[in-house]
């Protein structure tokens, strides 16, 4: 049955130079083909992962890796951060790669020769937005509409993160209905002419997961629509 089997595929990067440097043998074309074949079966969940902070992958190239994997639309896109464990290959080459990392668990990289600390913070912001809106499975229809506005999924989540941060939404706990208000507010900021499409997408997402007895305050009142429909049917 759907979801009984789950595959976890450690892509880590789509940058050839990075893949070679970490001594992996992987043909990306084969990975894409396999992922799409499994996806077509619609009965196996796929979790694909990316690692930020790997050698030879700067901020812009990591964005490309993110976009490449997001385009496959796995059930989960797990964005992790390079860990430098004592005795590991990365530990032995930390100086060469300019790795700055936590010396206590979880030993994650904070910056490197290729990615600055500020850039790593931006990637962490993307990871938080990805978890809240994509990996949670709660806003998939909304995101499908929003993606049409963006050439880069990474930039989409980054803009969303900046919006959350600038409005003080990051440090607060929000229920699902409140979060729909926030993402609708964001959509109006970046794609003002299509509010109705975002509203319909959010209503679908909301009721797909839970049966709510009341509609969100921003949703259109269906009573008027019902009256119009009844009047039309009586007249015809």
Predicted regions mapped to residue ranges:
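Conserved non-cysteine loop/helix-boundary elements of the Radical SAM core domain that shape
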Residues: 1-104, 110-113
